[in-house]
Structure formats: C-alpha cells, structure tokens
Amino acid sequence: MKASYLETLDRIKDEHAEMSKHVNQQRSDIEKVALEKENMNRSYMTYAEVSNTLRSDLRKAEEINKRLQEFIMQSLAPQLSQDNQANCLAALEAFKTASPRENGNGAPALPPGFPPGAAGMLGMMPNMPFGMSPAMSQLFNQFASPHVNGGDGAGGSSGGASEAKKAKLEDPDDGELEIDVTNDDHPSTASNGGAANKNGRDSTNSVASSGASTPSIASNSRARQQQQPLAGLQGLEQMNFLAGFNPNLLRQASAAGGFNFLNDPHAQARLAAAIGQIGSRPAYSFKIVDGGVPTPTSFPPDAQKGPGIPTGLKKKMELNHGEVVCAATISRDNSRVYTGGKGCVKIWDVKESDISGATVVNRPPIASLDCLKENYIRSCKLFEDGNTLLIGGEASTVALWDLTTETKTLDLETDSQACYALAMSPDEKLLFACLADGNILIYDIHNKVKVGTLPGHQDGASCLDLSKDGTKLWSGGLDNSVRCWDLAQRKEVAKHDFASQVFSLGCCPNDEWVAVGMENNYVEVLSTTGKEKYQLTQHESCVLSLKFAHSGKFFISTGKDNALNAWRTPYGASLFQLKENSSVLSCDISFDDSLIVTGSGEKKATLYAVEY
C-alpha cells in the first residue's frame, strides 16, 4: 500500500513537471507571438504612413494638373489663333495618353533621369509594390523600417553580427556606467540586415541587449538614436545600377516617399551602397565633404599595395589568459606581450623563434600581476623602457606597477567608478585618463598629483589618443561626440557630433586624420585640417578597438562581429579581414609594425605576424 502511494506521488510529480514544462513552453510561444504581432503592427504602421504619403502626393499632383489645365484653357488658349487653339487642345489630349517611353523613361512611372534598372525604387511611384525584385523589396524594407525613420522598432538585427555577443547597453538606476562581462556563447550564423532576431536577442543597437561577452558600457543617456546596420543587404550585388546617377534624385525620393534621406547620412550611405558598386563588390567606403551626401570612394591604383602596406596576418602565438582579455599591449622591443583580464595582468615572453617558426606557439605566462581587486582591466600603458606599467579599469584608481620587482608603486585616485582608457604624453610625464563620469583627468606621474581636468563629455568618456607632437588630445564618448583639446590651454577646441556612441579612437601619426569606431558598426575617418571624412562599413557589429600603425599608412579595427579589419589611411581601402571565434575586444600594433596582438571574449589573446 505504501509503495503504491509513493508511486502515485512520483507519477503526480512527473506529470506536474511535464505540465509545467508545457506551460512554460506555451508562455514562451505566447511571448514570441506577441513580439511578432508588435513587429507586424509597426510594419503595418510604417506601410500605412508610406501609403498615405503617396496618396497625398498623388492628390497634390492631380490638383496641380487640374489647375494647369484650367489655366491653359481659360487664360492661354483664348489668346491663340483658331489653328493654334486646335493644336493646343490636341496636344493636351495627347499628353493625357502619353506612354512612359514617349516621356523618355525606361520603365513605367519613373521620374526623368532615373536609371532604367531602378524600377521600383522606394517612394518614387504609386505602384511601386508591384513587380519589385527581391533585392528591391529588401531595400524597401531597409528604408521603410522604424529604425531608419528614428522609431524604436525591433525589426533590425546587427547585420550579421554573432547574435550571442550583442553589446549590453543598460540603464542602471544609479546613473553610473555599468560594465558587465560574461562568457561567450557559440557564435551564431550571420543574419540579414533588417531581419528580426530569431534567437530572441536584441540588436546591438538596442538599449537592453543581453548575452554580451564584451565589457559593455551602460549609460544614463535615455535618448539613444538607433541606427540600422548597413551590412546585410543580400542580393544587391546582382543589381545593375549606375553608380553616377543624378544626386537630385535623393531629394525627389525624400519628397515623394516621406523618408528623411537628406538629414540621415546613414540612410544616404545605405542608398549609395545599394546603387553604387566599386569593381565587383558593393561599396564599403564613402566620402563625405562638408556634411554632404555620401558618395562611394574612388581608390587610387596603389590603394592595396606598395611599401609598408600589409597583405595579411599569420598567427604565431595563442596566449590563454583564462579570462576575457579587455586590454593588450606589446613592448617596444617585441619581447613581451601584456594582457589584461579580470583582476590581473599577465606577462608573456615572445622569442624570435616564436615569430619565425611555422607552428603556433602556446605557452604559459612568465608572470601575473594581481591588481584592481577582481575588476576588469580596460587599458594598459607601458613606459618606453619597459619597466613601468599603468593599469586602468573598472575601479576608482589607476595603478602604477614596477615590472622589475613586480610590485605596485602607486594608486592614483580618480573619484569615478571606472577608467576606460589611458594615454601618456610623449615625455611620459603626464597621464590622461578617460573616466565613466565623462571627465578626462590629467596626472603628473613623477610628482604623483592630479594637475587638471578636462570636462565636456556629457556621458562616459570611452577612448582617447594624443597627437604625435603631444599638443592635442582627442577623446570620444558615450554622448555621441568626439572632442579635440588644446593641452597648452587645456580647453576644447573642436567637437564632432555623431549619430551613435563612440567606442574607440586613434590618431594617425601624421596628425592629419583621426579614426573613430562606433556602436552603430561604422568607422569614420575625420580630417583634422579639412571638412572631409570617410565612412567605412565593413564591420557587422559595434567597433570596440582601433589602432594606427606607427608608419601611419594603415590602421586596424576590431569588433563584436569577431572581425579584425585592416584599412588603408585615410580612405579606407580594405587591405584584409581576419575572423576570430569570438568578439575581438582589444588590439595593439608593435612599434615596428611587424606584430599585432588581439584580445578576445574567448579568454585568450592572439599574436600575429604582419605579412607584407
């Protein structure tokens, strides 16, 4: 009897567990259906707005046509002779039945001057949903999405980024920046830009993404402009558009379709990428002069070759740090690599045989420096003699370490929750620290005192770099701005505003260009002397680190799309792209431009030899 009773209880428990499982599954399905319904409602509202705009424009055109006919018939025709009146009336009747071919258009309902291959272009004709190719349908969806028009729809993906590694941009109650690092999941396959996330994760550009493997930066900024990624327009490679069509058609499209092309440079870049091709691949570099419309960049013949221009990388060492590597640097003589993770900096020995050998070397570190009390390290700066290391991260202090004795010699107080980036003056006397509260602190390293503050960023200061002569400091922030500071006067002398948070920044050694990596997947190269800039679109997720070669001829950028891209300075011709297995969080280039090190969410750093 007792055994039967226990068996009955076990069966009831099993049935209850099974029912709970089904209930949870149904609840999950209901949430997914609700999300899909919400997305469908947003899409419906977008299409309804487009339809209403087109109907309104059609009514306007009909009214204008009616008034013109009345004016001709009532005011002009009576002044003509009888023969001319008859000819005028006949011409008016002929105009009513004129075919598109007679009007000089290559396709029905296209405006004059539009390329024949552009039939069905967004917002240019009332009957555009009919007869559109799949590629054009996708292009329409890109421009009609709520993201493009400043909405907060959830239909956009990261344009091919690993969905398990989206940046987590949270908004904590305390108003401070929050850094969170979790382990990487297995990378997922790339998804099309503009498609809904199939695994339930939010876009990299959303305010509350989850599952990040990268140290994420949470901000108290509520007004985040969300940008639709440029990458992922599948099928556009097959479209035979003319690259040099009349730019005034952008204004016609903006007026006819209700889309804000002229005030959204990213929408302009997407349109330019769709219709302008360079060689056999879609355009990925765009030149913008004085805030104008982005145009595909024309590269010189030697853009991807020549002395000092790399052709690729060869893996030489794998440095298994054991934690997510948020900072990495190479010593001046290439004999050491320093990697920063959670609570420690590890030092790795690099031998000439490691670089010249044919096999990938994997060995333990020669030393480990315990620092920042189990907080993640975000920046390491090595003195030129290789004996002193500055360490900053998710702590209120910046640590100074003597590497000869492997002891900490100084803690510099920042009065902030975190320090995201460090830079030193050329004479190594001054230290500059980017802080979570938006300030940039200046320390006298030798006298061990704070000597100044550069206030200006309205949100966390995330990155900085010095000009080669040390007179100018460039900083980027989560307030969507890049600022230039005159260090002699210690005041802001220039400011550049963007549509996205700035995550990384680097100054070209010739002091003519500054490259900026952003949360919206773009790299922008700004001229320090003129009004032109280049916009580069190869990344499929946010750009986390950026570094110029010491020659100034090229620079590299890394991101949450697991990619390392090498670009020609300044116009961004792609030299090569390398994919790792996880988000690439940090990078450095050796002083002689022969080595590159990357730190990743795979809890390791990788040392590469640069091939020329």
From Swiss-Prot:
Residues 150-159 have a biased composition (Gly residues). Disulfide bonds: none annotated. Gene3D superfamilies: YVTN repeat-like/Quinoprotein amine dehydrogenase (2.130.10.10). WD repeats lie at residues 308-339, 372-402, 414-444, 456-486, 538-568, 579-609. Residues 202-221 have a biased composition (Polar residues). One of its GO terms (cellular component) is nucleus. This is Transcription factor unc-37. It comes from Caenorhabditis elegans. The gene is unc-37.
